């Protein structure tokens, strides 16, 4: 409402924050300097731990940002307690002192207390997910980590299916949603009944919003929404409609505190307004140094303050708070 907008503006003025608060592409973006120490500008994954620290997975190491500075972790040849692989594909954690990493060569655990890495599993792993337990996907099998034995126990085998899992999500009814690289999405109920709500596509991500709807990003099939009653909507790019989703290559979704859904795609950042059903596009622009650093968005996460953090393919980390529409970001250094 207009009253809310005026209140927010007054609040911003009260804080002496200078920001041009306009919609769309005309938002003023602020940014951090290039010397923050991000190990590499291609960000595959972001994770926020229980202390609000941002973990950043890149092609060349793991980074930890505490709000002031960045510490990088990389492979050290003769150190068994170091990170065993520099390419960090996915990050998750147990919100209780442990961070789990999916790397090109397997799965690692970082213990915040000892500040040491431990290799949990070596070899090719396709998916990682944490919800009370650590789950991984390898080809057509799901395993759960057993902390007593330090082994991964088989949880489910998609028998007779020559597929590769790509992502996992456990909903509150204990349904395990399994995204694949070619066969869409399978759903395994708590009593191990298997269904296949989406039958085709390479699935990039599965996200559950506050109203328990699932938002599923795919490589070429656009964005899927699975409503709580089971109805499935598919959003596709329409070149004739500027308010359609900007790309059919959808990598990530995240809901802000206002109830809008932010969608990271190959061609830009979309904001989806559930009330109007319209998508608004934000892209990088060389003429706007205070804009997004890169239009290709890999991952989005939200912190306790409602700030959204974006990992980009070629522009480091961007972050902003939609409630104030002030944008800041890490910028790629010229030296990289």
Please identify what each model-predicted range represents.
Residues 1-336:
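Carboxylate-rich, polar loop motifs that coordinate divalent cations or form catalytic acidic clusters
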């Amino acid at each position: 409402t207009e009253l809310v907008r005026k209140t927010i503006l007054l609040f911003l003025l009260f804080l002496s924050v200078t920001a041009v608060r306009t919609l769309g592409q005309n938002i003023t973006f602020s940014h951090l300097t290039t010397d923050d120490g991000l190990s590499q500008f291609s960000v595959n994954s972001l994770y926020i731990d229980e202390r609000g620290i941002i973990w950043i997975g890149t092609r060349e190491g793991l980074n930890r940002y505490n709000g002031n500075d960045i510490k990088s972790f990389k492979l050290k040849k003769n150190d068994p307690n170091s990170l065993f692989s520099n390419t960090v594909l996915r990050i998750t954690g147990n919100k209780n002192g442990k961070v789990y990493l999916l790397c090109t060569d397997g799965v690692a655990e970082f213990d915040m207390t000892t500040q040491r890495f431990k290799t949990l599993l070596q070899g090719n792993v396709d998916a990682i997910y944490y919800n009370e337990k650590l789950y991984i996907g390898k080809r057509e099998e799901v395993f759960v980590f057993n902390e007593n034995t330090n082994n991964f126990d088989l949880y489910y085998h998609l028998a007779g299916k020559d597929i590769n899992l790509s992502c996992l999500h456990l909903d509150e009814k204990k349904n395990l949603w399994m995204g694949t690289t070619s066969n869409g999405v399978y759903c395994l109920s708590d009593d191990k009944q298997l269904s296949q709500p989406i039958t085709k596509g390479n699935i990039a991500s599965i996200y559950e919003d506050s109203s328990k709807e699932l938002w599923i990003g795919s490589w070429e099939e656009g964005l899927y929404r699975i409503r709580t009653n089971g109805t499935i909507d598919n959003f596709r790019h329409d070149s004739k409609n500027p308010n359609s989703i900007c790309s059919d290559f959808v990598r990530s979704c995240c809901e802000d505190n206002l109830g809008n859904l932010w969608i990271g795609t190959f061609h830009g950042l979309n904001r989806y307004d559930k009330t109007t059903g319209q998508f608004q596009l934000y892209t990088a622009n060389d003429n706007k140094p205070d804009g997004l650093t890169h239009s290709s968005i890999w991952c989005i996460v939200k912190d306790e303050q409602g700030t959204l953090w974006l990992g980009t393919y070629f522009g480091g980390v961007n972050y902003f708070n939609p409630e104030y529409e002030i944008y800041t970001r890490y910028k790629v250094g010229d030296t990289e």
